[in-house]
UniProtKB/Swiss-Prot annotation:
Mg(2+) binds at K191, D193, E194. This is Ribulose bisphosphate carboxylase large chain. Gene3D superfamilies: Ribulose bisphosphate carboxylase, large subunit, C-terminal domain, RuBisCO large subunit, N-terminal domain. It is found in: Plastid, Chloroplast. GO terms for molecular function: magnesium ion binding; monooxygenase activity; ribulose-bisphosphate carboxylase activity. It comes from the Eukaryota. The active site is at K165 (proton acceptor), H284 (proton acceptor). It comes from Cornus canadensis. The disulfide bond which can form in the large chain dimeric partners within the hexadecamer appears to be associated with oxidative stress and protein turnover.
Length: 465
């Protein structure tokens, strides 16, 4: 048979530097840190093997299949600048290894086992190229950016949101009141916090009812379409769907899900329901930093963002850039483009390892939230552009005069920035001046400017190239 038992080096089978990648291959870029003494080719080949057809020894059933057709291949290795013992291993996977329309299966294959592998000290999945043939097996976001704008009748500016705080402990009625005040003041959206599900102090059904009431009341008074992200995340998929169905029955425009803690299977089911029933879907990335914070181990957020676009969501939290370092800005804008655009060119300076063609998959709105306030508005408008959601939690609710004036301050600041931009002014250079001018006409904005003039969150960026 030519079958020879025993252990053989991975690189004999799985390191193929002459391989020409196919248009249908899923391509992965791994940052590999091998154990001392393990050569790069062997480590790269081990990653390819253990995440596809390989196992630690030769098995006779290998003879019953065509390894050449099904094996992952490490086809290129390059050193990481400034790192002694790290390199980028590029691996190509044949499309047949993956179930159609299943992000769950894709991740189980590519990152399921190999991250615990002893020959490696650390491993990080930096990027994935999803071939068009695989993209087409996914529904993707329930609606996408254009449909959302049409549903909301809001054009030519970023959308404004606010997370209701304190996130835990309010009764449903007080919570609904906070929602109403923010929406009434001029915000487009308010948001359940990611850990607001159905706790003893506020059961989900009560919250949904009071928030729907707040939604309708604020719409009637302002003449604008409003939304509150009702968090449907639950302990079981059935319970999650029950909440989504109830939201639809209330006639609200949008629900929400924590896609990493809830899981991709649950998320994809919910996304399908949302498209079929006209609900927008807001996605929170709770737990992402557990996976993406370490520079040498885990999965970079741009991969989790791509996976979400495949699984389905209309909004996703994507960091703020503001008040942090410049290096982070390019990387963040890299995955923001991957969320929004149809076609994204390879650009290593922005952390994009592969050209990605999304064909006709709808786009996702990036959500900037976390530690931002009115002084950040010019920078946020300039960095994220119109197709984004800017979310101010404390930056709305912390206003010295209360929530409605806090909402007014944010809306005035945003409208001023958009108008200044449309008049050709430079938001990056004149931002503070633009806000100051606007605050002369808005006492609410002036009060907000006074409160937050000194607040900064200055730390070194973790996410550098």
């Amino acid at each position: 048979v030519g079958f020879k038992a025993g252990v053989k080096e991975y690189k004999l089978t799985y390191y193929t530097p002459t391989y020409e990648t196919k248009d249908t291959d899923i391509l992965a870029a791994f940052r590999v840190t091998p154990q001392p003494g393990v050569p790069p080719e062997e480590a790269g080949a081990a990653v390819a093997a253990e995440s596809s057809t390989g196992t630690w020894t030769t098995v006779w059933t290998d003879g019953l299949t065509s390894l050449d057709r099904y094996k992952g291949r490490c086809y290129h290795i390059e050193p990481v600048a400034g790192e002694e013992s790290q390199f980028i291993a590029y691996v190509a996977y044949p499309l047949d290894l993956f179930e159609e329309g299943s992000v769950t299966n894709m991740f189980t294959s590519i990152v399921g086992n190999v991250f615990g592998f002893k020959a490696l000290r650390a491993l990080r999945l930096e990027d994935l190229r999803i071939p068009v043939a695989y993209v087409k097996t996914f529904q993707g976001p329930p609606h996408g950016i254009q449909v959302e704008r049409d549903k909301l009748n809001k054009y030519g500016r970023p959308l404004l949101g606010c997370t209701i705080k304190p996130k835990l402990g309010l009764s449903a009625k007080n919570y609904g009141r906070a929602v109403y005040e923010c929406l009434r003041g001029g915000l487009d959206f308010t948001k359940d916090d990611e850990n607001v599900n159905s706790q003893p102090f506020m059961r989900w059904r009560d919250r949904f009812l009071f928030c729907a009431e707040a939604n309708y009341k604020s719409q009637a008074e302002t003449g604008e379409i409003k939304g509150h992200y009702l968090n449907a995340t639950a302990g079981t998929c059935e319970e999650m769907m029950k909440r989504a169905v109830f939201a639809r029955e209330l006639g609200v425009p949008i629900v929400m899900h924590d896609y990493l803690t809830g899981g991709f299977t649950a998320n994809t089911s919910l996304a399908h329901y949302c498209r079929d029933n006209g609900l927008l879907l807001h996605i929170h990335r709770a737990m992402h930093a557990v996976i993406d914070r370490q520079k040498n181990h885990g999965i970079h957020f741009r991969v989790l963002a791509k996976a979400l676009r495949m699984s389905g969501g209309d909004h996703i939290h994507s960091g703020t850039v503001v008040g942090k370092l410049e290096g982070e800005r390019d990387i963040t804008l890299g995955f923001v483009d991957l969320l929004r655009d149809d076609f994204v060119e390879k650009d290593r300076s922005r952390g994009i390892y592969f050209t990605q063609d999304w064909v006709s998959l709808p786009g996702v709105l990036p959500v900037a939230s976390g530690g931002i306030h009115v002084w950040h508005m010019p920078a946020l408008t300039e960095i994220f552009g119109d197709d984004s959601v800017l979310q101010f939690g404390g930056g709305t609710l912390g206003h010295p005069w209360g929530k409605p004036p806090g909402a007014v301050a944010n809306r005035v600041a945003l409208e001023a920035c958009v108008q200044a931009r449309n008049e050709g002014r430079d938001l990056a250079r004149e931002g503070n001046e633009i806000i100051r001018e606007a605050s002369k006409w808005s006492p609410e904005l002036a009060a907000a400017c006074e409160v937050w003039k000194e607040i900064k969150f200055e730390f070194e960026a973790m996410d550098t190239l």
